[in-house]
A protein has these predicted regions:
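Thiol/selenol-based redox catalytic cores and closely related redox-interacting motifs
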Residues: 45-129
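Local sequence-structure signature of Cys/Sec-based thiol-disulfide redox active-site neighborhoods
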Residues: 7-34, 38-41
């Protein structure tokens, strides 16, 4: 549970990405250009656990629905837009944990924040303070 705190203290932030994703590559290039210290994690090969997702969701203050990659083929093929409203929080967390491609990316996880998706102004405000 506290491994992310350790990552922050030792190696900067936790950056979750899918290398084939153009937005993730753009975000990573920006992080490197700004000399932001982070640990990289492939979101599909080392997918987030239910516990991690619950912790990040609570830390973010965002609705859980925002954690879904609504642009992804898997999300669309599973017709999740129609199904999520009928699912409990626990069911949604289990679903997110089942496949990293369902999770919105990239993510940057800090001790007291979660950045979801690459929004330059938000990233500058949080990471360059």
């Amino acid at each position: 549970m506290f491994e992310n705190v350790k990552v922050k203290m030792m190696k900067g932030y936790l950056f979750l990405e899918y290398p084939a994703c153009g937005t993730c590559r753009k975000a990573k290039k920006w992080l490197d250009g700004q000399k932001v210290n982070y640990t990289d994690r492939h979101i599909v090969e080392e997918r987030p656990t239910r516990e991690e997702l619950k912790m990040w969701f609570e830390r973010s203050g965002l609705p859980l629905r925002k954690f879904f990659n609504t642009s992804g083929l898997l999300y669309k093929s599973m017709q999740l837009k129609e199904k999520l409203d009928g699912m409990s929080e626990g069911e949604q967390l289990e679903l997110l944990a089942s496949d990293g491609k369902l999770v919105k990316r990239p993510l940057v996880i800090g001790e007291d924040f979660v950045l979801l998706g690459f929004k330059l102004e938000e990233w500058e405000k949080v990471l360059l303070k």
